[in-house]
């Protein structure tokens, strides 16, 4: 169980599909991915097939603006993995998060 409404989940998924590749994936992680925790911003982890940093930045910004318009002005953090970069936050987000797409 996660601490987002069905509407918020649906809007995250619909908005994500507008800005990222069909093969890309998104996870919710952090406190909102744990039903026992309280508060917290919406932490999203994305794995994308975009290879160009400018494309990643444009997709991220478009996604963030459209998502805030859809669900309201909430604190949303987005971590994106592209190319072959792998960091600890990527591993934690994927292991402890809940895949939405």
Q: Language-model segments: what does each one mean?
A:
Residues 43-45:
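Short, well-ordered beta-strand segments
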Residues 1-27, 33-39, 48-101:
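Catalytic core of pol beta-like nucleotidyltransferases
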């Amino acid at each position: 169980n996660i601490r987002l409404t069905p509407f918020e989940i649906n809007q995250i998924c619909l908005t994500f599909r507008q800005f990222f590749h069909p093969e890309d994936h998104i996870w919710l992680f952090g406190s909102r991915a744990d039903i026992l925790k309280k508060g917290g911003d919406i932490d999203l982890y994305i794995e994308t097939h975009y290879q160009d940093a400018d494309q990643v930045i444009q997709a991220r910004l478009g996604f963030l603006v459209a998502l805030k318009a859809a669900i309201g002005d909430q604190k949303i953090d987005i971590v994106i993995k592209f190319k072959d970069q792998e960091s600890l936050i990527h591993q934690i987000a994927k292991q402890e998060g809940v895949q939405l797409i």
